[in-house]
Amino acid sequence: MPEDGAGDGGEVPALIPDGEPLREEQRPLKQSLGSSLCRESHWKCLLLTLLIHACGAVVAWCRLATVPRLVLGPEAALARGAGGPPPTYPASPCSDGYLYIPLAFVSLLYLLYLAECWHCHVRSCQAPRTDAHTVLALIRRLQQAPPCVWWKATSYHYVRRTRQITRYRNGDAYTTTQVYHERADSRTARGEFDYSAHGVRDVSKELVGLAEHAATRLRFTKCFSFGSAEAEASYLTQRARFFSANEGLDDYLEAREGMHLKDVDFRESLMVFADPRSPPWYARAWVFWLVSAATLSWPLRVVAAYGTAHVHYQVEKLFGASSPPPGAVPSGPPLSRVATVDFTELEWHICSNRQLVPSYSEAVVMGAGSGAYLRGCQRCRRSVSSNSLPPARPSGPRLPFSRSRLSLGAGGRATPGVFRSLSGGPLGRRGEDTEPLESPPCYEDALYFPVLIVHGDSGCQGDGQGAL
């Protein structure tokens, strides 16, 4: 809540609890006339109003205007025989029943106009009306509410069913069998982001100046962000683990995710008045219907939109803003990267927690002895990027994981595989001293045996190396 300052007499936002820095202020903005027209044009009401007034102008023209009409009969024949002008008389241009056509259009358009006004009134009443103090208390509860980032996975399939329906053709009823497919949910799983090891903090803005406007339309949204790379990696890892664990359980998978605030009633739209018991004249119901009956609803809506201030308040939660508590325990094994789900071998190492995959910059500056801890292990020799080159070129530069791929061999053979360079150049060309590459396996072998590295339960204990 803002309070008066002692020196400059301005407003200073309140301090966030726990000694955090001051929040950034946010004020409602009053739009110009052109901006209010672009924001809420109410084109249906404007179009119906113009059509009603056009039909009314046609009716008035038919009743008030006169046109000369020729006189038929003996008098006209005598006038033509005498060589004078033909006799005429003034008459209405919409005689002979043509006046009822614009009247019918006016009646129909007026009914449509009243229906559109009723829909507009219902939409305006859907937003709850409250005062500024209640809104500030609600914002304080939103800022203090703990977030919950959730995931939902629904496994389902379609069941073929039949039903009997009756159809009519040429007055005869006949029964036919209709085949349709009905969705059947087989399993539903829910998960939440565990941020206890990273902490969370509210970084929403401080809303001030609500009492300065007679009417303010407030729109709420919520979002979250990350203050550290560790928190973002933990979120992506938990999310990928959740959806990968629920993938393939049925024919189809419906994935949903979102965020809600616990123990608080979140409303997306509010109408705030300085005094809800006496709102401005353009926001009263009897004024709206009185003006609408006179087909002046569109000008009233323009005045109301111009006199209403707007503010979009976003509740934002920041994960990873504080250091983890002393007793915090990670929710699972530390998976380094989730962008390697398409690489079978790297994903196997990550899920098994056997090795940490370096980033591209780390792999470029990796030294010659970075893979020495695995050279003694015959079963892990193929998982090190320093062994990705053919043995005939031991002193050549090394390829990072992101620039090489494994040439798949037979599933049960112990012959070390060879990495092929995708970057071209000397590393991608086969020299005379390069060993011949193994032929790739067939599609079925690669599909059923995607992982060529087999580790025992004891890791590398048998080869004299510790577990990674």
Swiss-Prot record:
The keyword Transmembrane helix applies. GO terms for cellular component: axon; dendrite; endoplasmic reticulum; endoplasmic reticulum membrane; membrane. Residues 1-21, 384-438 are annotated as: Disordered. InterPro entries: Tmem151 (IPR026767). Keywords: Cell projection, Disease variant, Dystonia, Endoplasmic reticulum, Membrane, Transmembrane, Transmembrane helix. The chain crosses the membrane at residues 45-65, 98-118. Changing Y282C: In EKD3; uncertain significance. It is found in: Endoplasmic reticulum membrane; Cell projection, Axon; Cell projection, Dendrite. Coiled coil: none annotated. It is a multi-pass membrane protein. It is linked to Episodic kinesigenic dyskinesia 3: A form of paroxysmal kinesigenic dyskinesia, a neurologic condition characterized by recurrent and brief attacks of abnormal involuntary movements. These attacks can involve dystonic postures, chorea, or athetosis. EKD3 is an autosomal dominant form with incomplete penetrance and onset in late childhood or early adolescence. Symptoms are usually triggered by sudden movement or stress, and resolve in most patients in their early twenties or later. PANTHER family: TRANSMEMBRANE PROTEIN 151 HOMOLOG, TRANSMEMBRANE PROTEIN 151A. Belongs to the TMEM151 family. This is Transmembrane protein 151A. It comes from Homo sapiens (Human).
